[in-house]
């Protein structure tokens, strides 16, 4: 997979909840060891990210910038932990976060193109591109996937994603070869492009468990994490 660093967290219990606890504890410790003053850090959202950030200690560093890598507003009353993750992460790094006060996927490319032209939104997007560290997880295309519970997709779109994709990074869905699985949905997605992740000094994927194996493989084949 051409990775520069791999960390493996062991869970004595094969259940996903146990794996998630050990994984996020290890990830929190790992992030504490690599973040330094002056870093620009882009971060995604989701349960894994929230657990990881919650377990981090407050770091005595300065001049760090934290930016959200994708929109975070949900259409349904399901918590994606976007705001909580971002603000808590920034607080532990003695800074304020730059946010996307928007849904991550809009109904049309026209709407998305108009939104990203806004100077405030474009500033956040550009800061995400400038980030030297990106921290994210992979989602799955199983029915219980957070994206499918947040109201972003029609039934036909959800069906197509389940058939053609293996997972997502920053709400950009890819197939087993790491290629974008639906260009139309991708064109309406607000946030960092997957190709931008390849340029990062540290592109950090935090994920584990049987349910995410295909998504992890696709992400690594695509070269989105190093």
Predicted feature locations:
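N-terminal active-site beta-alpha-beta segment that forms phosphate/nucleotide-binding
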Residues: 1-109, 213, 221-226
